[in-house]
């Protein structure tokens, strides 16, 4: 993966299955068969993609334009693209399973709103970034942040939780601005912790 062969471009939705492939083993719900599990993971991914021009993919021109990573951002007031898709695709599943997806949506919506409330109009939120190759996640973050800074955005916000490698953000220049416990996902033995980070662009 040489820098001169890398190209940052607008994300193409036809590549969404490649993103889902990466996070599917990490975000499997505890209920349903493999078909539902993948549906629910795609639902979570789509909950992080907005109707805007801040959807990117990093490709390697030396490898037939292979998709190396993807990154999705949200501004205050942006809308996510998931509602119509969910209404259509969820019809094949029973109400019990759709309730599980509803729990995911409640959590995602709450954390998005909590993060957006901390932001100013000239701040932007990193909703999701996914790497398919070692180092490609850091690279797309570097390139997109350069572009965002040039456009005048001031700060980058994101939220994550204890299921993810949240320590990575501390090591890469982000400041922890809020830490909470999400009771519905907590157990007697372990609190389910959520984190909101900020970094100056």
Predicted regions and their residues:
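A short beta-loop-alpha structural element at the N-terminal edge
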Residues: 3-21, 75
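Glycine-rich phosphate/pyrophosphate-binding loop shared by adenosine-nucleotide-utilizing enzymes
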Residues: 4-6, 64-70, 124
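Active-site rim helix/loop that mediates acceptor-substrate recognition in acyltransferases
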Residues: 32-61, 72
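Short hydrophobic/aromatic beta-strand element in the GNAT-like acyltransferase core
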Residues: 53-57, 70, 128, 194-196
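Conserved acyl-donor/pantetheine-binding loop and adjacent beta-alpha core of acyl/acetyltransferases
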Residues: 75-128, 184-189
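Conserved GNAT acetyl-CoA-binding A-motif
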Residues: 120-125, 148-161
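Conserved acetyl-CoA-binding loop-helix of GNAT-fold acetyltransferases
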Residues: 133-147, 171
